[in-house]
């Protein structure tokens, strides 16, 4: 099948959130299944020097009253084809924000539609989040191109109808209130990035005022869990980690822990319980819960906390004040640093994700891969990926709580701290977490089933029986299943 993915991000070149990881890592797994998969993204300024871009455009056209060109490049790691939409509105390196954000992405969607109609015509055009939301609306006219729309975060919904009517030429059948609603209404298939999130967004609590529409289209809505690139994220080969380790030599993690403590200004003591967090510092991620419980936790236990990220200034200030009040025990770096994030995954004892909502979450998968035990709220993709620790039955992969309340989060933190003191049991917990496999293999099989379904292809694909061989979290190594 010919499949074109359209998105605002593509890792590792352009990445802000989980969407970039999906768009960058899903194509190689689909290509292994025999499909011709390509990606189209805006031609942001820095991409022209990062990628080997064709000298001449492969396509030129005019849309929304302005000319644009499409150039061809190759993904720097996986070598599949990437198309860049060239236009002065994308010349800066800024991805989101700005006064013309709505126009920029509506223009990108229109340019992508023109490209798909007139240059490289896919059988499936896979659109990601509101930035590409107008594509299913336009493609609804073309019976030869099927559209799939993936919801990465329902909270961000794009420009409203009145603004779209001014920017586009087809307001008369725009029944949705905004880009996200229009995409869900007109796409042939819709998926969320985890099964639990697909169910949650049909409720008032998580539906962001779209629960009515989501229930209306529930027949074409499904949840497909994201994965991670197991080659890129491998603690046994990670060049960034000072000490490489695997499930068979966990003692090497202690060296990473000491270096992490030193780099973040914490007391260097491997016996201390070290909690890590790598996140956007926003309400969605539950940073306000961390602010509410940290003082009590640090008073009651000998824990240390290391936070890496940027975001809301109020939350940043609260974390900074904690670092001033608890030197050597609480540290925050208000930036994003890939090397330091890997060190946190590979050196912390546990990883914090007390999210208000979490469509899928990638960080908990990386934490488990690197032996850091996730402490999560049971919501969205965290429900699908982290199993509650049960010391009596030696099962589970993390610590979970249900209500978004400080006392519930605090209780999970204390439970994890007490579990950490039982070293043999903790080591088994780490091994269970590290033995989980959330590769893109199963996700790609599920996407393939959806693609063939939407195109009406009846020939057998690796169907449900084949997919079941790769149950979520199942280890590829049979020897690890008994841990």
Swiss-Prot record:
Coiled coil: none
UniProt key word Membrane: no
GO molecular function per UniProt: alpha-1,4-glucan glucosyltransferase (ADP-glucose donor) activity; alpha-1,4-glucan glucosyltransferase (UDP-glucose donor) activity
Keyword Transferase: yes
Keywords attached to this entry: Glycogen biosynthesis, Glycosyltransferase, Transferase
Pathway(s) annotated for this protein in UniProt: Glycan biosynthesis; glycogen biosynthesis
Pfam families listed in its UniProt record: Glyco_transf_5, Glycos_transf_1
Residue positions binding ADP-alpha-D-glucose: 15
Catalytic activity: [(1->4)-alpha-D-glucosyl](n) + ADP-alpha-D-glucose = [(1->4)-alpha-D-glucosyl](n+1) + ADP + H(+)
SUPFAM superfamilies: UDP-Glycosyltransferase/glycogen phosphorylase (SSF53756)
EC number: 2.4.1.21
GO biological process, one term: glycogen biosynthetic process
Family, similarity comment: Belongs to the glycosyltransferase 1 family. Bacterial/plant glycogen synthase subfamily.
Function, in words: Synthesizes alpha-1,4-glucan chains using ADP-glucose.
Name of the featured protein: Glycogen synthase
Taxonomic source organism: Prochlorococcus marinus (strain MIT 9301)
Organism lineage string: Bacteria, Bacillati, Cyanobacteriota, Cyanophyceae, Synechococcales
């Amino acid at each position: 099948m010919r499949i074109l993915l359209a998105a605002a991000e593509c890792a590792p070149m352009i990445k802000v959130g989980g969407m970039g990881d999906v768009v960058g890592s899903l194509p190689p797994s689909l290509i292994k299944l025999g499909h011709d998969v390509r990606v189209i993204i805006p031609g942001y300024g820095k991409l022209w020097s990062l990628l080997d871009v064709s000298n001449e455009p492969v396509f030129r056209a005019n849309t929304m009253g302005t000319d644009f060109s499409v150039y061809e490049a190759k993904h720097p790691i996986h070598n599949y084809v990437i198309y860049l939409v060239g236009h002065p509105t994308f010349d800066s390196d800024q991805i989101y924000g700005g006064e013309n954000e709505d126009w920029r992405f509506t223009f990108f969607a229109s340019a992508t539609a023109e490209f798909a109609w007139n240059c490289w015509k896919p059988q499936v055009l896979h659109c990601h989040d509101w930035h590409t939301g107008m594509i299913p609306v336009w493609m609804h006219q073309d019976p030869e191109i099927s559209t799939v729309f993936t919801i990465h975060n329902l909270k961000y919904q794009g420009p409203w109808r009145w603004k779209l009517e001014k920017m586009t030429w087809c307001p008369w059948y725009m029944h949705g209130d905004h880009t996200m609603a229009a995409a869900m209404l007109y796409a042939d298939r819709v998926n969320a990035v985890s099964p639990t999130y697909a169910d949650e967004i049909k409720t008032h609590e998580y539906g962001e005022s779209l629960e009515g529409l989501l229930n209306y289209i529930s027949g074409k809505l499904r949840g497909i869990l994201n994965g991670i690139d197991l080659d890129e994220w491998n603690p046994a080969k990670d060049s960034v980690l000072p000490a490489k380790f695997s499930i068979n030599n966990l003692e090497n993690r202690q060296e990473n822990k000491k270096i992490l403590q030193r780099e973040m200004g914490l007391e260097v003591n491997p016996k201390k319980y070290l909690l890590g967090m790598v996140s956007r510092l926003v309400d969605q991620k539950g940073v306000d819960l961390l602010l509410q419980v940290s003082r009590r936790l640090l008073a009651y236990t000998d824990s240390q906390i290391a936070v890496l990220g940027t975001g809301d200034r109020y939350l940043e200030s609260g974390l900074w004040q904690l670092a001033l009040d608890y030197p050597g025990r609480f540290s925050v770096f208000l930036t994003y640093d890939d090397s330091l994030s890997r060190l946190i995954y590979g050196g912390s004892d546990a990883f914090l994700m007390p999210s208000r909502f979490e469509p899928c979450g990638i960080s908990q998968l990386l934490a488990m891969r690197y032996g850091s035990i996730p402490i999560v709220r049971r919501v969205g993709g965290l429900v699908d990926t982290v199993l509650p620790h049960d010391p009596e039955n030696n099962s589970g992969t993390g610590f979970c709580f249900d209500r978004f309340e400080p006392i519930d989060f605090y209780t999970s933190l204390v439970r994890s701290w007490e579990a950490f003191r039982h070293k043999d049991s903790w080591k088994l917990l780490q091994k269970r977490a590290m033995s989980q496999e959330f590769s893109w293999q199963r996700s790609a099989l599920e996407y393939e089933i959806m693609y063939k379904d939407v195109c009406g292809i009846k020939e057998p694909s690796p169907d449900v029986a084949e997919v079941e061989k790769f149950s979520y979290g199942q280890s590829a190594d049979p020897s690890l299943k008994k841990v």
